[in-house]
């Protein structure tokens, strides 16, 4: 990466202070910035086990009297062996073994299971035993597929058999989908359910919670982290009970599969390519000869059932700690590590997963992010020496927006604010950008930590909280987040700062006092902070806007209105800025010794403008297109038939001539990364008439991301990454088209 990342030692939740007992800016240990299957059975969305995981046709054979000759029959064992499960006779004469490999080893030889110390029959272990018995009862070849076919033939209405994933149960209460403080009714597994009807009561301000910071996916666009779902009629794959010895890698091309049964075979390993099956919610590998499982299973963050009963496993990879939605981890029938078994008995699957997560050593840091050069950063004889400067924008994930229940895939020590804030500061200081724009920074952290620490590094800054802070007590105000802008004092002089409060602007617009404006816009307290700066050496001017737009894709109209109001205000501010007297005492090296000059006829559009924004929208969205093209028609679908006076009567239009700094590389692959969402939603816009982008900091290494569930983690302290760009003032103003429109 471009900046160093802390390679902390193995940590535990019992001693978190080791990660944050110092206020030093530098962190120790940092670097400088600078098959086709042999016998496949494809079934139409196997009803396979019921949502509880138990066989739909009982624990014996399905109707038809199939008999599996290699299954040992046990009867009436009322006290299941605490370490290796129990063997109970099944209905219809089917029995099943116990111990490693279902009481079966190579060539079908049956053995007696080893004995171990009794295990307390806690509720967690009772659940474990019930799930083990359900899996052991499915040892016949393609048991689930046959059961599904019989179930389908048993009805006179085949169409009544739902083509759905039987394991697609509601999300576990242990954690959320990684989008903090999201309305769960609007997103499932990160996919939009579409725009709710206008009568949806969830749209009223009283029932909609305060704004979170991470976006939900935009309606009409699939979740970027998952491939579009193919039109496959099946999502379950049953390869169970056919004595497979290995799995072909071709199997893992079926990336839409949600349930994979490879139980009761002779597998000694699972290929690491299983990491391709990102949609898996159930993996049953019961009754094999596995001595290890691949750490890559840890990236299958949608898993709810991982059944590994009756194998030869002695330990589990720490990477399973990121399976934050896992409801059942089946380990009975394995010579498992005593500590892991005890943890599961006492605290259940969630307790064991949390233990693995918090005791995992930090993974290797990613490679440095690489700079991508776009234009040369050189002076020309005609323009003379011109100013170069760098801009960094960063949503730092406010501490109050990062509860452990939301980011349950993140180790507790890495989610701890004291650890995160030190790593955030390290990134900012090492980047050493001339202008730094932060979103989601609360009043307390600005005043007590970031401002004083960055002051030592030569920065000055301004911070404004959201509008709600005005109605709160002093203590409550400290926890309200907002936007902060920092600049290097040796390079810039502050002329003035302004805060733009969107709900207050909405109140002032008498020609737009519609019901939708009151109910949808005025209840959102997003803001923008504008800093008017002057280069100390050349006397040139720079306007920096820093904003955080509303997140919810169901309120795309609100986003448009907020951006429309922001552009109107920026046009007023730049015009006012152009009327300031010109600085005459400048360095003669710059601009061929001439003081900067701004024409009144340009109305401030000849002043370089930077807009750093967490837009909470993809490139190609209405708000992005509006900023980049200068106009949006009033009947645009993203207004969602709501009425906003002249905005919806005649559309939105601005004349600032903006362009995204990363447009030259097709935008970043992502700037926000969680288990259910990965997309670019943070941007730096600029005015190409007055300056050029010389370079941008590239994406995070893809190989690293492929092994990572989401941010924050040990190396990335926020669920966002910073967007970092280098600019150069042109020293001349590109001419406008004949119609005077900078976009046409």
Curated annotation (Swiss-Prot):
It is found in: Cytoplasm; Nucleus. GO terms for biological process: nuclear-transcribed mRNA poly(A) tail shortening. Residues 86-100 have a biased composition (Gly residues). Mg(2+) binds at residue 440. GO terms for molecular function: 3'-5'-RNA exonuclease activity; metal ion binding; poly(A)-specific ribonuclease activity; RNA binding. Belongs to the CCR4/nocturin family. This is CCR4-Not complex 3'-5'-exoribonuclease subunit Ccr4. It comes from Cryptococcus neoformans var. neoformans serotype D (strain JEC21 / ATCC MYA-565) (Filobasidiella neoformans). The gene is CCR4.
């Amino acid at each position: 990466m471009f900046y160093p990342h802390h390679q902390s030692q193995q940590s535990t939740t019992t001693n978190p202070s080791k990660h944050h007992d110092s206020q030093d800016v530098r962190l120790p240990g940092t670097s400088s910035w600078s098959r086709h299957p042999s016998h496949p059975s494809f079934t139409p969305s196997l009803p396979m086990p019921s949502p509880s995981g138990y066989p739909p046709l009982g624990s014996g054979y399905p109707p038809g009297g199939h008999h599996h000759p290699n299954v040992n029959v046990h009867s009436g064992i009322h006290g299941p062996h605490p370490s290796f499960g129990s063997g109970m006779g099944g209905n219809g004469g089917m029995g099943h073994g116990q111990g490693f490999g279902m009481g079966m080893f190579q060539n079908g030889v049956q053995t007696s299971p080893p004995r171990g110390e009794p295990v307390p029959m806690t509720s967690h272990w009772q659940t474990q035993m019930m799930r083990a018995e359900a899996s052991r009862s499915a040892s016949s070849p393609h048991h689930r597929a046959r059961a599904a076919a019989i179930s389908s033939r048993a009805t006179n209405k085949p169409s009544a058999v739902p083509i759905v994933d039987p394991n697609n149960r509601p999300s576990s209460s242990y954690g959320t989908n990684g989008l903090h403080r999201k309305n769960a009714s609007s997103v499932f597994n990160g996919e939009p359910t579409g725009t709710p009807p206008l009568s949806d009561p969830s749209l009223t301000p009283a029932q909609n919670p305060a704004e979170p910071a991470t976006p939900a996916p935009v309606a009409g666009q699939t979740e970027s982290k998952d491939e579009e779902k193919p039109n496959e009629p099946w999502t379950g794959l049953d390869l169970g009970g056919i004595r497979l010895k290995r799995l072909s890698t071709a199997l893992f091309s079926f990336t839409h599969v949600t349930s994979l049964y490879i139980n009761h075979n002779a597998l000694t390993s699972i290929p690491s390519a299983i990491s391709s099956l990102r949609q898996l919610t159930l993996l049953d590998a019961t009754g094999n000869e596995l001595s290890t499982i691949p750490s890559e299973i840890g990236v299958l963050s949608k898993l709810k059932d991982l059944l590994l009963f009756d194998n030869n496993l002695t330990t589990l990879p720490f990477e399973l700690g990121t399976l934050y939605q896992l409801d059942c981890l089946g380990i009975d029938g394995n010579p498992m590590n005593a500590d892991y078994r005890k943890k599961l008995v006492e605290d259940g699957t969630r307790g064991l997963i949390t233990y693995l997560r918090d005791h995992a050593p930090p993974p290797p840091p990613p490679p440095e992010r690489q700079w991508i050069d776009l234009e040369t950063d050189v002076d020309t004889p005609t323009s003379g020496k011109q100013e170069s400067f760098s801009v960094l924008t960063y949503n730092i994930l406010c501490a109050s927006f990062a509860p452990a229940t939301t980011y349950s895939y993140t180790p507790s020590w890495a989610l701890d604010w004291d650890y995160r804030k030190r790593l955030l500061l390290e990134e900012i200081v090492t980047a050493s950008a001339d202008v730094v724009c932060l979103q989601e920074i609360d009043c307390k952290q600005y005043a007590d930590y970031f401002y004083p620490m960055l002051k030592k590094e030569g920065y000055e800054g301004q911070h404004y909280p959201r509008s709600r802070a005005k109605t709160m007590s002093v203590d409550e105000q400290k926890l309200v987040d907002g936007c902060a802008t920092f600049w290097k004092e040796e390079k810039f002089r502050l002329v003035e700062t302004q805060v733009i409060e969107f709900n207050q602007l909405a109140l002032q617009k008498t020609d737009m006092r519609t019901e939708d404006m009151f109910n949808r816009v005025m209840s959102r307290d997003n803001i923008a902070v504008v800093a008017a700066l002057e280069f100390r050496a050349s006397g040139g001017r720079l306007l920096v806007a820093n904003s955080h737009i509303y997140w919810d894709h169901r309120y795309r109209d609100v986003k448009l209105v907020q951006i429309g109001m922001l552009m109107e205000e920026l046009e007023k501010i730049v015009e006012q800025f152009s009327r300031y007297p010109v600085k005459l005492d400048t360095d003669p090296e710059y601009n061929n010794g001439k003081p900067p000059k701004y024409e009144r006829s340009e109305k401030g559009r000849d002043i370089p403008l930077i807009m750093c924004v967490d837009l909470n929208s993809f490139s190609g969205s209405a708000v992005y297109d509006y900023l980049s093209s200068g106009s949006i028609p009033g009947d645009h679908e993203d207004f969602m038939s709501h009425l906003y006076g002249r905005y919806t009567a005649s559309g939105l239009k601005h004349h600032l001539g903006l362009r995204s700094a990363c447009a030259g590389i097709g935008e970043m692959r992502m700037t926000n990364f969680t288990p259910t969402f990965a997309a670019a939603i943070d941007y730096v816009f600029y005015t190409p008439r007055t300056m050029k982008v010389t370079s941008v900091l590239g994406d995070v290494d893809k190989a690293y991301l492929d092994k990572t569930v989401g941010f924050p983690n040990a190396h990335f302290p926020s669920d966002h990454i910073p967007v970092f760009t280098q600019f150069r003032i042109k020293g001349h103003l590109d001419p406008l088209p004949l119609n005077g429109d900078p976009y046409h």
